[in-house]
């Protein structure tokens, strides 16, 4: 019964998030957290406690964002006080277009464990409630602790002390784009805008290009150009000023420039 209530709350939140004001959205978020606390359960993709490890509140906690969470506006919808988000490189993970959203009927970004791969990202400080809210946002992903040795700071001298969390899936759970679940241009815009925001804030000349280069399966054959009618729920008009730069980075190259071809080039 508790799981049904949580699922209903998440569904309502997702729908109302498009229609309500920031104040109403905050109220929805608070209600979600109350239900989680009351039920003493975690909303996880695998219904397993291992997918949502406990949070040690005696140390600082940080979330690593590598997709829409890189975008300060998108991130702020879930964690309002997360403007400070320094860039990092994360070793041992591959960023790939391979996570389907059933409600949105689209394919989003996913990080999978893969030795020998590195991707760029950001991190931001998060309270226990912030992490629970992000658990709800990333309900189909597992939250895992990333060893400090696998995180390289960029633009700042060193990493702060604490635990670093990231939302991932195993490769066996990857679901690739197709005609029914395309990549949304507006989601790619939100992701790449976050990369360019970080590039400007920390004066990193190629950070945006690195986002593209360390992301795999840019499947242009299954791509929905939805800028005239944005389909992504967390799309922000702020991305429009970055469009020319985004289009320069996401080159309209041959459809065969997919995951396999990019891997062969490594």
Residue ranges, per PLM feature:
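Terminal signal-anchor or tail-anchor transmembrane helices
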Residues: 1-22
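Ser/Thr/Pro/Gly-rich low-complexity linker/stalk segments immediately outside membranes or between
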Residues: 20-37
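A glycine-rich, hydrophobic/aromatic-adjacent loop/helix-cap motif
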Residues: 32-266
């Amino acid at each position: 019964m508790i799981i049904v209530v949580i699922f209903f709350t998440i569904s309502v939140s997702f729908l109302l998030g498009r229609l309500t004001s920031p104040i109403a959205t905050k109220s929805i978020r608070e209600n979600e957290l109350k239900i989680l606390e009351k039920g003493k359960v975690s909303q996880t993709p695998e219904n397993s406690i291992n997918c949502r490890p406990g949070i040690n509140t005696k140390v600082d906690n940080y979330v690593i964002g590598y997709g829409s969470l890189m975008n300060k506006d998108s991130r702020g919808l879930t964690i309002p006080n997360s403007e400070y988000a320094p860039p990092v490189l994360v070793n041992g993970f591959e960023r790939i277009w391979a996570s389907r959203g059933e409600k949105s009927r689209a394919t989003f970004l996913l990080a999978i464990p893969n030795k020998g791969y590195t991707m760029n990202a950001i991190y931001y400080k998060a309270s226990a409630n912030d992490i629970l809210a992000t658990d709800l946002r990333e309900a189909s992903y597992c939250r895992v602790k990333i060893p400090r040795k696998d995180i390289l700071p960029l633009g700042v001298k060193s990493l702060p002390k604490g635990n670093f969390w990231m939302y991932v899936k195993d490769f066996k759970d990857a679901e690739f784009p197709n005609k029914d679940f395309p990549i949304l241009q507006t989601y790619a815009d939100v992701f790449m805008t976050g990369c360019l925001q970080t590039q400007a804030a920390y004066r990193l000349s190629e950070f945006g290009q690195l986002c593209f280069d360390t992301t795999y399966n840019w499947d242009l054959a299954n791509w929905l150009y939805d800028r005239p009618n944005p389909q992504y729920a967390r799309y922000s008009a702020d991305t429009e000023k970055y469009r020319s730069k985004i289009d320069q980075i996401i080159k309209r190259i041959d459809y065969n420039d997919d995951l396999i071809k990019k891997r062969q080039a490594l």
